[in-house]
Amino acid sequence: MKRKGMRGMIFYVVVVLVLLGFLLAGWLATATATQDSRLLPIIMYHDVVPDGEQLDEYTVSATQLEEDLAALAREGWQTVRLSEVIDFVQNGATLPEKPVLLVFDDGYDSVLTQVLPLLEKYDARAVVSVIGARAQGLADGCDTSRQYMDWDALSQALASGRIEMQSHSAQLHVFRARKGLQQLPDETEEAYAKMLLADMNQMDAWSEDAGVTMIKSFAYPYGFVEPLADSLMRKQGYEATMTSEPHVNRIERNPDCLYRLGRFNRSGCMQTDALLKWLTP
């Protein structure tokens, strides 16, 4: 009887240990998956103007931006650098539990006058998508609008340590027969590849001459994606691309996840509360 009781006890202990093993394995798998992936919303801004000026789909006020930054911090979101996201994917680096990426398209001069002071106030980071022709036109004296940053201003923003730069194309931020990077109907793949490579090389030459370091990332002008451009950019060493498709991104230890990243356009016609609702799928 004692042996039967002992056998029963041993059997019971074995069953419990097996169940605990399964539970522990499941917990470890979940923990590992959580460590190896993040949900990353990207908020896309354009121009930021002083309070009282006209707002539209691509223009927000300084107060709206400050309300966004305050709300993000209050809700536990942490702004991250694009280089940190790439490092997480490629090299196993860490990211906060609730990362968010802020991107300012086109390189408006408001990045220096309106955005940077608020980034410093809220200890935030951002990425600027640079249109090479705008910066170069100002540097050459061909553009006197002063609406955008020239290369010296971009260098100043970069020196803050809070801002990184990515390409928004050299001369393809256009909306004519060719819309952004779209291939023309009668354009051969060879001709398209030659055109795009020339634009990428021009952007590299301008930024290198100006001493402005660019992350190897590309924001599609107007959000127009092009399958042929995807493969060409990868061959040229681009590590990430961004669209204007409004969705949250899942970032994993797989470089493929960095291409065609979705972004939410922050309109000046919406409230911060509506913005926060976008951030979780």
Describe every region a protein language model picked out.
Residues 131, 197, 209-217, 224-270:
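His/Asp/Glu-enriched short active-site or ligand-binding loop at hydrolase and phosphoryl-transfer sites
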Residues 43, 47-50, 55, 98-100, ...:
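Metal-dependent polysaccharide deacetylase catalytic core of the NodB/CE4 family, i.e.
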Residues 1-9:
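N-terminal Lys/Arg-rich, disordered targeting/topogenic segments
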Residues 59-73, 107-109, 144-152:
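Aromatic- and glycine-enriched glycan-recognition loops and surfaces
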Residues 85-87, 111-115, 141-158, 246-251:
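Alpha-helical scaffolding within the catalytic cores
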Residues 11-100, 259, 263-267, 281:
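N-terminal pre-catalytic segment of deacetylase/amide-hydrolase enzymes
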Residues 103-108, 114, 121-124:
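Substrate-binding cleft of extracellular glycoside hydrolase catalytic domains
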Residues 65, 112, 196, 200:
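Aromatic/hydrophobic pocket-lining residues that form the small-molecule binding cavity
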